[in-house]
């Protein structure tokens, strides 16, 4: 016995072999016949996979499968088991820890699926950056599916509940069989030619891999990728994945989930509407305050009421008309939008909410109009008062009381000594002026 090699216990040896099997050998696919199938109450499944010359023990643990998965598999059935090798240390038996089971013959389909998936991924068809954003509130929704399947009923009922005002266009197509891929492609092309939809739902109900195989077609995948309209896939159940799911702009777990993904909720729309009304009211208040500041600024800049009062009156009247007109147009525009929502939402009868909003908007118009006119009248009254005050202290008002302003060579005289006998002086009266000659000077 060589002294160079360490002496291992059985446990150590089995542990090393187990580590090698689990870490060095990756996922394997093994085809064989089921025998000695055991289904204990723990939920785990144990069986032997064999061919004509060899066999291997297999373990399919509960957390790897659904409870109903192996009900369709029995002793003597040919399957393909996918999993990783391990070692049961207590008995030194190596085994296959199964992760997935399919019927024999299905392995070819999975291989084709993986090859196409890798090919399209390398071309960038699955990249998130090339995927289009879904519209927030689509007016028209296109549905590509069988018109007689369960999927279309699930989609229509969900759309009717969540967003009944949306228009629906159904592009009928087979979703299973040899003709299905080309029909699905034609439906996608037709929807893009019409350009009437803001989003498309590509859907069908659940089924086996053969049932869903039409959605693994390469030509269909490329058509989804070049679609100008965002495509939402809702194919099969949550655990089903197709090539179309990877290429679609959004993958939903089921047809119902796809309908939910493309629609807002009516309650959310009402919240948006309430927010818009609040912002409208706030914008009008800011507009009024801004115009008030502008008017105050103009008033402060008045230099001579006699020269500018007429212009300011006209400006004030013009601003009043412009403000009322702009406010009325703004409110009427939103009333028109409210009327449009009222028409589309008749199916859900939100009439009371809409009428209440209309009344609030009309009251807002009347209230703001009245407040603006009151403020304008106050400003007019203030201007009139200021004008009267300025006139009262004006030198011209003194002339009205019988006084005169005497000037010589356009310079006002304050004392008799500023003039000489023979000078010509101007005497300005309240009405008119006199040119007088000085004949006598008195102290």
From Swiss-Prot:
This enzyme catalyses: Exonucleolytic cleavage in either 5'- to 3'- or 3'- to 5'-direction to yield nucleoside 5'-phosphates
Entry function: Bidirectionally degrades single-stranded DNA into large acid-insoluble oligonucleotides, which are then degraded further into small acid-soluble oligonucleotides.
Judging by the UniProt lineage, the source's domain of life is Bacteria
Q: Does the keyword Repeat apply?
A: no
Q: Which UniProt keywords apply?
A: Cytoplasm, Exonuclease, Hydrolase, Nuclease
Which GO molecular function annotations are given, in alphabetical order? exodeoxyribonuclease VII activity; nucleic acid binding
Main location group: cytoplasm
Q: What is its EC number?
A: 3.1.11.6
GO BP field: DNA catabolic process
Q: Which Pfam families match?
A: Exonuc_VII_L, tRNA_anti_2
Q: List the InterPro entries hit by this protein, alphabetically.
A: Exonuc_VII_L, Exonuc_VII_lsu_C, NA-bd_OB-fold, OB-fold_nuc-bd_dom
Q: Where in the cell is it found?
A: Cytoplasm
What gene name does this entry carry? xseA
Q: Which family does it belong to?
A: Belongs to the XseA family.
Q: Which GO cellular component does the record give, naming just one?
A: exodeoxyribonuclease VII complex
Indicate what this protein is called per its UniProt record. Exodeoxyribonuclease 7 large subunit
Report quaternary structure and partners. Answer: Heterooligomer composed of large and small subunits.
Looking up Gene3D superfamilies in the UniProt record yields: Nucleic acid-binding proteins
What does the record give as the organism's lineage? Bacteria, Pseudomonadati, Pseudomonadota, Gammaproteobacteria, Legionellales
């Amino acid at each position: 016995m060589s002294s160079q090699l360490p002496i291992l216990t059985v446990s150590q040896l089995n542990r090393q072999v187990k580590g090698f099997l689990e870490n060095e050998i990756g996922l394997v696919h093994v085809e064989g016949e089921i025998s000695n199938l055991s289904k204990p109450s723990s939920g785990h499944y144990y069986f032997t996979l064999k061919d004509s010359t060899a066999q291997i023990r297999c373990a399919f643990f509960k957390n790897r499968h659904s409870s109903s998965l192996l009900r369709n598999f029995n002793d003597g059935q040919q399957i393909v088991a996918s999993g990783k090798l391990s070692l049961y240390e207590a008995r030194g038996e190596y085994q296959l820890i199964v992760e997935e089971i399919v019927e024999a013959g299905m392995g070819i389909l999975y291989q084709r699926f993986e090859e196409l998936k890798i090919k399209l991924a390398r071309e960038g068809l699955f990249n998130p950056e090339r995927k289009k954003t879904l519209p927030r509130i689509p007016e028209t929704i296109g549905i590509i599916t069988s018109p007689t399947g369960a999927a279309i009923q699930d989609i229509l009922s969900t759309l009717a509940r969540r967003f009944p005002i949306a228009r629906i266009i159904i592009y009928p197509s087979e979703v299973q069989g040899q003709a299905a891929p080309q029909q699905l492609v034609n439906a996608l092309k037709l929807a893009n030619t019409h350009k009437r939809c803001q989003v498309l739902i590509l859907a069908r109900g659940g089924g086996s891999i053969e049932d869903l195989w039409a959605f693994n077609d390469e030509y269909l995948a490329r058509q989804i990728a070049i679609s100008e309209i965002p495509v939402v896939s809702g194919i099969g159940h949550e655990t089903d994945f197709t090539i179309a799911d990877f290429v679609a702009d959004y993958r939903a777990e089921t047809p119902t989930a796809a309908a939910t993904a493309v629609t807002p909720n009516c309650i959310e729309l009402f919240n948006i509407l309430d927010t818009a009304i609040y912002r409208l009211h706030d914008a009008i208040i800011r507009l009024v305050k801004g115009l008030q500041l502008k008017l105050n600024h103009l008033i402060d800049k008045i230099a001579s009421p006699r020269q500018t009062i007429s212009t300011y009156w006209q400006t004030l009247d013009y601003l009043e008309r412009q403000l009322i007109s702009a406010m009325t147009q703004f409110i009427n525009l939103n009333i028109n939008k409210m009327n449009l929502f009222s028409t589309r939402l008749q199916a859900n009868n939100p009439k009371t909410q809409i009428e209440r909003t209309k009344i609030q908007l009309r009251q807002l118009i009347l209230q703001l109009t009245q407040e603006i006119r009151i403020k304008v009248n106050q400003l007019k009254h203030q201007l009139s008062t200021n004008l009267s005050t300025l006139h009262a202290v004006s030198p011209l008002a003194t002339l009205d009381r019988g006084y005169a302003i005497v000037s010589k060579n356009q310079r006002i005289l304050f004392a008799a000594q500023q003039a000489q006998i023979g000078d010509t002086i101007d005497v300005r009266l309240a009405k008119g002026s006199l040119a007088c000659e000085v004949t006598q000077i008195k102290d």
